Amino acid sequence: MLFRSQYPEIKKNAEALGARVVWNPHPEEGISSSMKLGLLEVIKEKPQAQSFSASRENNACLFLVADQPWIRCHTIEALIRMYTESEKGMAAAAKNGQPGNPCIFSGKYYPELLALTGDTGGKRVMRKYMQDVALLEVPDKKELTDMDIPPDIS
């Protein structure tokens, strides 16, 4: 779990639940800084992930965001199943055919993810290689709603 909050109790609660927490000391550098920190942690933990040509089933990373509270476990499971059963190198939950979060990237795309800068996330890589993206259209669009500020809750 990548930790990017000013509230230490969130980190403490996540660790109490068994999450491995990685602190992002520079969230102002944008989405790419968080993605890279998380991915580098995976590579550090699983050295075989450095072999970007490793099999897609054994070398993939699932990215989720914390501000989608209505996402269902069933949707995440369906996304993983879709990725596993497809021949694609990426999979993403979609709204109206547009890829979003959560999303999965095979190791083949790690170099491009690690090269991202600023407030640019994995969507840039997905859009570049749309033919290699399996899209899971989520029927309940509320699941994919980002809740960045309190008015978003209603």
What are these regions (language model features)?
Residues 3, 93, 102, 114, ...:
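Glycine- and other small-residue-rich loops at beta-strand/loop junctions that grip anionic moieties
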Residues 1-66, 70-99, 129-140:
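Nucleotide and nucleotide-moiety/phosphate-recognizing core
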Residues 111, 115-154:
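Conserved alpha/beta core of the MobA/IspD/sugar-nucleotide pyrophosphorylase nucleotidyltransferase superfamily
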